[in-house]
Amino acid sequence: LELVAERIKQMKDAGIITSASVTPQRTSWMAKTIIDSGLDILVIQGTVVSAEHVSKTAEPLNLKKFIREFEVPVIVGGCASYQAALHLMRTGAAGVLVGVGPGNACTSRGVLGIGVPQATAIADVAGARMRHLDETGVYVHVIADGGMSKGGDIAKAITCGADAVMVGSPLTSAIEAPAHGFHWGMATFHPTLPRGTRVRTQVRGTLKEILLGPAHENDGRLNLMGALRTSMATCGYETLKEFQKAEIMLAPSLQTEGKAMQRSQGVGMGH
């Protein structure tokens, strides 16, 4: 716990907006220490988090009471359905993480048989956000968590209704990343039922090149923000809020139509 507090202080001293992720079981125990360290945003995260916690071994977290008494904004997740998201929003959460098992390193969908396709989950949670806005006048941010490796994936998440995205594997491809091209992300570690694995992502460039470019490859894994801006411009939108209103469709052939040569040669969209 002291090490967590020390790292928060180091990032704050560097002028970085700092967040910390805790599980529901450890939230109350860690709360005072991390808030005293100057934390800007608290993330309460599990595979699936509900507004009502049940525990036979410890005092369950009263999420609504905790959020209302906490001094900084709280983001909660994951969730993947309209009703679960609406319940989380009604606790006072500033943002909701969307995604159960879409990440590259996560095996929850195979181990537990639980998950919702990410585009559907984002759209459903965005619908809950609009209902909550109509009921309360409070806008809750929808954050797509996992399943995005390319700029086009981020663009599609925004058009489905996300306000922001949380990515893992693209950042592990940075030269600066400590694992040097490997990713073991936020997937659940468990001594008897692990639900995550280590995957190779390869080193592709600097963190700046991955996020802001310039790209020296044409597969969409570099210059993610440049791809998002170009996607918005191509569709005729200037802001993310406008882009959320773009028309979307289910198009399985989008990645393969007219790309036979790329696939046969293993280049571009064919690898």
Where do the language-model regions lie?
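Active-site entrance/lid segments in N-terminal catalytic domains of soluble metabolic enzymes
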Residues: L1-T136, H141, L171, K259
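Alpha/beta catalytic cores of nucleotide-metabolism and tRNA/nucleoside-modifying enzymes
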Residues: L3, E71, G113-A144, S149-H271
